[in-house]
């Protein structure tokens, strides 16, 4: 996401690193000189329905990696790479948001949104309901809702 907005992720030689989470192990510097200036003038809200941090046993790699087919060794390597990334971001921005609830969302996009874009996080259903005027639309109505499956990470899980 940050690359698409103009950020460059550099290794120790000043070359751009490869794409992908494991490539973050080689990260040594983040160049924000080309970051889109319009980002400083907007308020960003993120629809986020998970509270996972970026790293650690409850982080993106450990929780979501196995769901995507990552082996235990790949999970550990990815968590190490994400910690490298978080360390560099913390030094660059003088703040560490790796443990922010939602930082581990979408493979770490939550972390980038919070750290670089100062995004505010809201539950997805709340954001959509507010934007669509749902509370006014259903006043006086009876509404039934169902979720196709229950996952352990959802707050409503048993």
Task: Identify the residue ranges that each predicted region occupies.
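Glycine/threonine-rich beta-strand-loop-alpha-helix active-site module
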Residues: 1-43
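Gly/Ser/Thr-rich active-site loops/lids in small-molecule metabolic enzymes
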Residues: 2, 6-13, 65-83, 123-130
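Short coil/turn connectors at secondary-structure junctions
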Residues: 7, 12-14, 39-43, 59, ...
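Short beta-strand segments
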Residues: 43-51, 146-150
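Acidic, glycine-rich loop-and-beta core segments that form the ion-binding/anion-interacting portion
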Residues: 50-51, 55-96
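Oxyanion-binding "anion nests"
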Residues: 77-144
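Histidine- and/or cysteine-centered catalytic micro-motif in compact active-site loops
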Residues: 126, 149-152
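Glycine/threonine-rich flexible loop motifs
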Residues: 153-158
